[in-house]
Amino acid sequence: DLRSLHKLRSDVKQQVSTAVSNLHNAEAAAAAIAVPERNGDLDPAGWYTLATNVASTMGVQIEQTMEFNCGGQSGENPNGFVAAYYCQMPDRSQRDIMHILTTHPDWTQTARSPWLVDMVKHELSHRSIMISCGTTQPKIASDRTEAVTNSYSVLFFGADRDRITNQQQGVAEYAMDAHSDQLATAIHDGNCG
């Protein structure tokens, strides 16, 4: 009957509201974890532990891997650029896992720097966007998915904008600006396009 349908709708709306609130609270907790500024502030084990702590705040574990493999789409790392990745799988089997490529040419330097934590925050942002929008590539982001994801990581996970900009210099699809910040905020507010 109509009354039970209204009750069901109300219950679902409340569950969604609670889930979004929990997601945003976890993002804020991850952002609150202090990240040292300089490479030498921690040794590689310390940086990895810090990155793992940030991920675990979101209920995510980091898997180190030697080759790109996302749901059977394995093979060459596109342009050798991908250093970490998050897989969006229809069955949610990878929902709480992010991957770091230890074969990336810059892995040795990355493993000894705060850039590792920013990379993790970027991948966690893909996950948050996927949870909020049902996809890592929401319509609102258009062809700016990576830039919007970077903006999301800066605005809601506390990633370092300058460090990201320096590390990804010359890679246009990752370049943040006021518009990518606006789109990330819209997604965070529940507008996926």
Where are the predicted features?
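Active-site scaffold of zinc-dependent metalloenzymes
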Residues: G75-W115, R127-I131
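Soluble non-cytosolic domains of exported or imported proteins
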Residues: D41, A45, T110-W115, M119, ...
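Active-site recognition of the HExxH zinc-binding catalytic motif
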Residues: P114-G134, T149-N150, V154
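Pan-zinc metallopeptidase signature
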Residues: Q182-G193
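Long, low-complexity, Ser/Thr/Pro- and Asp/Glu-rich intrinsically disordered
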Residues: G71-F81, M98-I100, H122, S151, ...
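Auxiliary, metal-adjacent structural segments of Zn-dependent hydrolase domains
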Residues: A31-D96
